[in-house]
Design a protein with these regions (language model features):
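Rossmann-like AdoMet
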Residues: 1-69, 75-105
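Short amphipathic alpha-helix with an adjacent loop that forms part of the alpha/beta core around
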Residues: 109-117
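A short, conserved alpha-helix within the catalytic core of class I
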Residues: 111, 129-145
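A conserved beta-strand element that flanks and buttresses the S-adenosyl-L-methionine
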Residues: 121-122
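Conserved beta-strand signature within the Rossmann-like core of class I S-adenosyl-L-methionine
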Residues: 143-158
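Conserved Class I S-adenosyl-L-methionine
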Residues: 163-188
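Short alpha-helix
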Residues: 182-208
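Core SAM-dependent methyltransferase catalytic element
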Residues: 210-225
Length: 225
C-alpha cells in the first residue's frame, strides 16, 4: 500500500540519521532494505528528513505545548519522545494496524473534530501528496483552533532541472515503490508563495524555517493560528 511505503521510507531515513529508533519497528524487512537503498542513492533526501525532524523537535521543546496534533502521523514516534504532552495522531485507518491510538482521518473527506482549544499542529511530509484544494481546506480547518502550526511543502523554486544519474535512478525506483507514474502532487511556487498562502488563510507570525543543507525541495513554515 502506497501510504505504508512512504511512511516506511521516512521512518527508515530517520533511523539512518540516528534520530528515531522507534518508528522503524513498524517497517518490514523488505521495505527497510528498499528505503535504505533509496537513501544511499539520494543522501540529500535523508539529510532533508533529518533536518526537518530536528527543527520540528526543537520547536516542540521551545513552544512546549500542552497538546500536539500530528496530521499524517505515519510511524512517527514523537508521542514516545515527548511523554508529558498530550498527542492526537491522525492518519488513514490503515495505520491503526500498527498504532492503536491513531485517529482515523482522511484529508479532503473528514472534518477535524478535536476537543482541544490550544495545540501545536504538525503536518509533516503530507502536502506534496495532496491536491491544492485539499491543502486549502486543511489549513482552513486548522485555523479554527488556537495555537501553532508547523507544515512543510515542496517548492518549485527549489527544483533543479539537471539531475545526476543517481537522482534519475532514485526517481525511477521511488515511483516503482510507491506505485505511481509521477512522484508528487501539490507544490508551492516559491517561499513567498507559501507565506502568501498563510496570509490568505488568516494565519499570523509566519516564519520560513531554513534548512542547513545545500539542496532540497522541502520548505518548512511556522505560523500562529
Amino acid at each position: 500500500m502506497k501510504v505504508y511505503r512512504t511512511a516506511a521510507i521516512t521512518a527508515v531515513w530517520r533511523s539512518m540519521s540516528n534520530l528515531d529508533e522507534y518508528s522503524v519497528k513498524h517497517v518490514n524487512l523488505p521495505s527497510r532494505f528498499l528505503a535504505y537503498i533509496l537513501g544511499i542513492l539520494d543522501p540529500n533526501s535523508v539529510a532533508t528528513i533529518s533536518e526537518r525532524t530536528r527543527i520540528i523537535d526543537s520547536a516542540i521543546k521551545k513552544i512546549n505545548p500542552k497538546c500536539i496534533v500530528e496530521i499524517g502521523a505515519g510511524f512517527s514516534s514523537r508521542q514516545e519522545k515527548f511523554e508529558n504532552i498530550k498527542f492526537y495522531e491522525l492518519d488513514l485507518p490503515y495505520f491503526q494496524k500498527f498504532k492503536k491510538n491513531v485517529i482515523s482521518f482522511e484529508i479532503g473527506k473528514d472534518k477535524l473534530k478535536l476537543k482541544t482549544k490550544d495545540a501545536l499542529f504538525i503536518v509533516e511530509g503530507v502536502t506534496m501528496y495532496l491536491q491544492k484544494e485539499q491543502v486549502l481546506s486543511l489549513l482552513k480547518q486548522i485555523r479554527k483552533y488556537n495555537g501553532h502550526i508547523l507544515i512543510d511543502f515542496f517548492s518549485k523554486e527549489q527544483s533543479t532541472k539537471k539531475k545526476s544519474m543517481r537522482e534519475k535512478l532514485f526517481k525511477i525506483l521511488f515511483k516503482l515503490i510507491i506505485k505511481r507514474n509521477y512522484l508528487f502532487d501539490y507544490r508551492i511556487d516559491s517561499i513567498q508563495d507559501g507565506i502568501n498562502l498563510f496570509k490568505k488563510s488568516g494565519y499570523k507570525n509566519i516564519k520560513y524555517l531554513e534548512y542547513k543543507i545545500p539542496k532540497t525541495l522541502d520548505v518548512l513554515f511556522y505560523a500562529q493560528l
